[in-house]
Amino acid sequence: MSRRVPDVVGEYRHISVDLLDRDDCRVKLGTVAGITHIFFAAYVEKETSVASVPPNVDLLRNLLDTVEPLSPNLCHVNLMQGSKWYGNHLGPYQTPAREDDPRHMPPNFYYDQQDMVAARAAKKSWTWSAARPHGICGYAVGNPMNLGMLISVYATVSKALGLPLRHPGSAANANALYQVTDTKHLAKSVVWMSTTDACASE
């Protein structure tokens, strides 16, 4: 599901729904029963970290409020987070980052989402997990947050202008630790997380 109708036709049933709109969720998702696993990757960009918290929590809350009552066999909710959990948007942070590292000073909507899901799961029979990839490369229509696409565009423009392909940043930036995962590997990993008991509530 997504708010925007995808340009790509596939072997799936797409539901166009605005997760920020509780009524739209009830109308569009109110007939979808029997969901066992939720893979949540919705995101709303705002100008500040403070402003990002309410809408990003609402996206998830509206989904769960609608789907949970219709899905008594819900088993697992997976949250797609990212390295902002560790504070990469605030500057240098300890690497390698670990899941049990202390949280940075809020606000961070990942914290609010995870706390909400953990609190709900504690009262239910379903579990949750969180994936925190750094950079993601893969096919994503209309999504500029894709390092592979950005490098491809930069290389194409450089070639068209007759320029050599050079790193556009500083030496420190070029030598910084950065991890990238492919969307196919990421998809396999979250399916594994959502079906492996050892990953429950992690």
Q: How should these model regions be labeled?
A:
Residues 117-145:
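Conserved beta-loop-beta element that borders a ligand/cofactor-binding pocket
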Residues 2-5, 83:
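Residues in the short beta-alpha loop(s) of Rossmann-like NAD(P)-binding domains
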Residues 102-105, 134-149, 168-183:
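Glycine-rich "substrate-gating" loop/helix at the edge of Rossmann-like oxidoreductase active sites
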Residues 6-62:
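NAD(P)H-binding glycine-rich loop region in Rossmannoid oxidoreductase-like domains
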Residues 9, 47-49, 85-89, 138-140:
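Short catalytic/ligand-binding loop motif for oxyanion handling, primarily in non-cytosolic enzymes
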Residues 155-170, 176-202:
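Alpha-helical substrate-binding/gating segment
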Residues 36-40, 50-51, 55-109, 121, ...:
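Conserved Rossmann-fold NAD(P)-dependent oxidoreductase catalytic core, especially the SDR/UDP-sugar
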Residues 14, 128-130, 202:
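Conserved beta-strand scaffold positions in the cores of enzyme catalytic domains, especially
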